[in-house]
Structure formats: structure tokens, C-alpha cells
């Protein structure tokens, strides 16, 4: 495959989320004046554990599942990040897990949380498994990784196809191994087991805060603003609801099967009532558009909240939004980012916009550690304060240095890890 003359990257490289992440980290460290060895330390996770998990299935057979856990950097504190149940494992998926653990480190640095990044999961399709099979699998995974996780080592959380029930099973299994009730081992738990108010909607809350701040910078009134949301899963559906309730006009939404568009605004409450547990709603309608058409709709604010590599050099010239806020991980390629920046479209990067989830997970961990719990209003107030501060810090750095917000965010995120590593004597 031919390489791009300007970057040396092949087309495949451009869609490789790990290589893209490493490229921006390298550039951020160069701008901050750090030597090459800092990049060598931070460019990949410090640990990637792969485990085999035997599970007795309901029919009596034993199936062997593969699990993994990546820990990027623990110079600042315990690593932190989600556990996903994903049906496919390929070299590309392992690269994605590495990149996700790095993004978690960046998010924690940006919000100033005492964590590094982690990420993990199990190769399975939960849609084909019974309730009890999922429980046995969840407990088996915890037994397999128990030596490298814990409240002061690595604190997991929910991710793709995992939820508060799975977190509860995992917490219970770890507590049995630890011989001590350990709610701080994992976050995203049910409230009755030490979960935090606001955790389920935290990612969307954080994105909403960033949208409002970005709209202020560009002089856009949220009331009546035209919003398009790609993705109608947890983050996308909550976000559409929050935007609708704030007075915005949500003119487009989509799921994996297509999109819906109404220039007068969609009935979000109606759609929420009819979506299934996997965030699917468009199959109920005949008059749909493609995800590609949805991204290119005329709107004020576009929120990619689905999967990576959605805005690329192929379609970035066609984006008509004034602001793009990344609720998903890695939805815009580096080439797409440059095109949007050149066109003066404000892009709020994923490592900032989607940091609400890990921030409220941190709140849950703090509440577990101190045994004192906050109201939903207190959680939302603390989240808004931290997100607004981080947004303004990055926006000002981007303006002062004449760089895009993604590079500015990476500079803030890597600096904390680099300094912690330096003081520890690692570099």
C-alpha cells in the first residue's frame, strides 16, 4: 500500500487508532520540550495481560474465553478504565485496547485525576449468552486478573456491553478473593453496592458541558441550536435527551442501521421509549438516511458518539457543522482533524469531551474510600466545575499556541505523566 508523501503514512496507518494516538503524543511531547525517552515510555501500555477463562456453559460444556487487561502508566496513581465484552479479537482490536488505555491516561491528566489509564475486556458476544453464563464469565475474568487489579492498583469500570450488574458480580468475586468487602475495586456499580449518583449518564453530562462551553465561545445560543448526534447508545441517547431538555433542536440521530432526520427537530422522548437495549431505533422507520449523510447534515453542533474513524479526509470537507464535539473515542482521524481546523470548525477532542465518565468514576472511588456519599446535585456540581475548568484551560492553550484543541489536550494530558515519571526517577 502506497504511503502519503507528506506523512509517510499508508491509508491503513491513517485509520490505525494506536498509530494516530502515538503521532499526537510524540508531537505534544516535542512541543513541551521532553526528550525522546519520554515518548518511548508513554507510547504503549507498560503492561498487557492476556488470560484464558474456562466457563461451564448451561448445556454442560466448557468454553474457553480470552480476556485481556492493558495498563498504560501508573506514575500518577492506580490505572483506571473500562472492561468491554467484544465478540471479535484481532490485531486491530488489541491495538484499539492499547490506544484506549492511553486515552484514559490522557483523560485523567486533562481532568487532573490521580490515575493512569487502563482498559480491558473479554472476547465474547453477550447477546448469545445466558444471565448465569455471563455471571460465571465475569467472575472467572476477575479471578484471572486479580493479581494486577485492586483499589490501589487498577480500578475497572463498565464499557461496551457491560453494565452495573456485571460490575456487581466482579466486585463480589474480588471481595471473596481479597477476603474483605472492596467496593473501591471497581466503579459503575449499583447504588446499593456503593455506586455513585450520576454515573450512568456521566459521559453524556460531560459532553453536554463541553457543548455548552464551545457554543459560548462561538456565540451560539443552545436554545434553538441544531444538533446532530451519531450513535444512540448510552452516551448518544442521554446526550440527545440533555440537548433536547436544554432547548436545542435535535435534528438528526443514528444507530448502526441508519439515521433519522427532521429539520424541525426529532421527538427524542418518543425515540427513547422505542429504542432497544442495544440502542437501536431506526429499524422501526422506513424513511431513513445513511450514517454518512447524517454526518454531513447542515447543523450547528455535530456529536459523533458511535465508533472510531467516522470523520476522515474523505468527508471532512463536507462537514457543515460549526462545532464538532467527540463523544466517541477516536471518531476523527488526524487528517480529518486538520481539515476541520483549516475550515475553522471548532473540534472538541474525545480525551476532553468524553472525560465525564472517568470523572464520576473517580467520585465513586473517593466515596467508597471515605464511606460518605454525595447527592446527585453534588456530583453534577463537582463534575461541571472540573469539566469547565479543563475545557477553558485547553481552549486557552490552543488559542495562545495557535494549535488545535486535540494537540492542546494531549499536551496537558502527557505533561502530568511525564512530570510524575521524572520525579519518580524513571526518566
Curated annotation (Swiss-Prot):
Example GO molecular function: glutamate dehydrogenase (NAD+) activity
Keyword set includes Metal-binding: no
Keyword NAD recorded: yes
CDD domains associated with the record: NAD_bind_1_Glu_DH
Residues annotated as the enzyme's active site: 119 (proton donor)
Induction data: Constitutively expressed.
Keywords: NAD, Oxidoreductase
GO biological process, one term: amino acid metabolic process
E.C. code: 1.4.1.2
Family stated for the protein in its record: Belongs to the Glu/Leu/Phe/Val dehydrogenases family.
Quaternary structure annotation from Swiss-Prot or TrEMBL: Homohexamer.
Protein name: Cryptic catabolic NAD-specific glutamate dehydrogenase GudB
Amino acid at each position: 500500500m502506497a504511503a502519503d508523501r507528506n506523512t509517510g503514512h499508508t491509508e491503513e496507518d491513517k485509520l490505525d487508532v494506536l498509530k494516530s494516538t502515538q503521532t499526537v503524543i510524540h508531537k505534544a511531547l516535542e512541543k513541551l520540550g521532553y526528550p525522546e525517552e519520554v515518548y518511548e515510555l508513554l507510547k504503549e501500555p507498560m503492561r498487557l495481560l492476556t488470560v484464558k477463562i474456562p466457563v461451564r456453559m448451561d448445556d454442560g460444556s466448557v468454553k474457553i474465553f480470552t480476556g485481556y487487561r492493558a495498563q498504560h502508566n501508573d506514575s500518577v496513581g492506580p490505572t483506571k478504565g473500562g472492561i468491554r465484552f467484544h465478540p471479535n479479537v484481532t490485531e486491530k482490536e488489541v491495538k484499539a485496547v492499547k490506544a484506549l488505555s492511553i486515552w484514559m491516561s490522557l483523560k485523567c491528566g486533562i481532568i487532573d485525576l490521580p490515575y493512569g489509564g487502563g482498559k480491558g475486556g473479554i472476547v465474547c458476544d453477550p447477546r448469545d449468552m445466558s444471565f448465569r453464563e455471563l455471571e460465571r464469565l465475569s467472575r472467572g475474568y476477575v479471578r484471572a486478573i486479580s493479581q494486577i487489579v485492586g483499589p490501589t492498583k487498577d480500578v475497572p469500570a463498565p464499557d461496551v456491553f457491560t453494565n452495573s450488574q456485571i460490575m456487581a458480580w466482579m466486585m463480589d468475586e474480588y471481595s471473596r478473593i481479597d477476603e474483605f468487602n472492596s467496593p473501591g475495586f471497581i466503579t459503575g456499580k449499583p447504588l446499593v453496592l456503593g455506586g455513585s449518583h450520576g454515573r450512568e449518564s456521566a459521559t453524556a453530562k460531560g459532553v453536554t458541558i463541553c457543548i455548552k462551553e464551545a457554543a459560548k465561545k462561538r456565540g451560539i445560543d443552545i436554545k434553538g441550536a441544531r444538533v446532530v448526534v451519531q450513535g444512540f447508545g448510552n452516551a448518544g441517547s442521554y446526550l440527545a435527551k440533555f440537548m433536547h431538555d436544554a432547548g436545542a433542536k435535535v435534528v438528526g440521530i443514528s444507530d448502526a442501521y441508519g439515521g433519522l432526520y427532521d429539520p424541525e427537530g426529532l421527538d427524542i422522548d418518543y425515540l427513547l421509549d422505542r429504542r432497544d437495549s442495544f440502542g437501536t431505533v431506526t429499524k422501526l422507520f422506513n424513511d431513513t438516511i445513511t450514517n454518512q449523510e447524517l454526518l454531513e447534515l447542515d447543523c450547528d453542533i455535530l456529536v459523533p458518539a458511535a465508533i472510531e474513524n467516522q470523520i476522515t479526509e474523505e468527508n471532512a470537507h463536507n462537514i457543515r457543522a460549526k462545532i464538532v464535539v467527540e463523544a466517541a473515542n477516536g471518531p476523527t482521524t488526524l487528517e480529518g482533524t486538520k481539515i476541520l481546523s483549516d475550515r475553522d470548525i471548532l473540534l472538541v477532542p474525545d480525551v476532553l469531551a468524553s472525560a465525564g465518565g472517568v470523572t464520576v468514576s473517580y467520585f465513586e472511588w473517593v466515596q467508597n474510600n471515605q464511606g460518605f456519599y454525595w447527592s446527585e446535585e453534588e456530583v453534577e456540581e463537582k463534575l461541571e466545575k472540573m469539566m469547565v475548568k479543563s475545557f477553558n484551560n485547553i481552549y486557552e492553550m490552543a488559542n495562545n499556541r495557535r494549535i488545535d484543541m486535540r494537540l492542546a489536550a494531549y499536551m496537558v494530558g502527557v505533561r502530568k505523566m511525564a512530570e510524575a515519571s521524572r520525579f519518580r526517577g524513571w526518566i
